[in-house]
Amino acid sequence: MDLASLRAQQIELASSVCREDRLDKDPPAFIGGADVGFEQGGEVTRAAMVLLKYPSLELVEYKVARIATTMPYIPGFLSFREYPALLAAWEQLSQKPDLLFVDGHGISHPRRLGVASHFGLLVDVPTIGVAKKRLCGKFEPLSTEPGALSPLMDKGEQLAWVWRSKARCNPLFIATGHRVSTDSALAWVQRCMKGYRLPEPTRWADAVASGRPAFVRWQEIQR
């Protein structure tokens, strides 16, 4: 595994990330959610992609792709491991979203290329990274109240917003993926909340990927 080459690719790709608002359709008609997991001890990469109507946030389509994992887990290089399955699920969608939430980091990455940014560049779609853990940077401790907010900073640069979306829950790290500004990324996540820790697009992607009760109930209603 030539990590020096992958690192150079990350730096080059990161320079192409658009950190400004460049939505083709604003407000979007459809917002997507993406989540990646691994099965069979990491041998299989599973990506779930969902499509929600906006502003109702109603689930209208989902696709799950499973492919052989092509790369081991190496911190800081996760997007190279995850994007092939994401691309396979994306290509199955009959309708592509105008904005995509990705479970993972955007520019809040040591080389400014988390999976939300990498995938956004690959398919040239506006993306937002919604991560559950910090990868780099520092932030001031948040109060315990829902709505508590702090910028994630690294070397004098804001990489994300750290936002407590729900009481007694760990905060989310919300960042530009591609073609969405940092402030707009936060605003879009806030518009897509329905009382859970996660915004609806990534909550549904996780539900589909893991076969959670909410998704099972949705399937039963569709029958």
UniProtKB/Swiss-Prot annotation:
Q: Note the NCBIfam families from the entry.
A: PRK11617.1
Q: What is its EC number?
A: 3.1.21.7
Site Interaction with target DNA: which residues?
Answer: Y73
Q: Which gene encodes it?
A: nfi
Q: Name one molecular function that GO assigns to this entry.
A: magnesium ion binding
Which residue ranges does UniProt annotate as crossing the membrane? Answer: none
Which organism does this record belong to?
Salmonella paratyphi B (strain ATCC BAA-1250 / SPB7)
InterPro entries linked: Endonuclease-V
- Name the record gives this protein: Endonuclease V
Gene3D superfamilies associated with the record? archaeoglobus fulgidus dsm 4304 superfamily
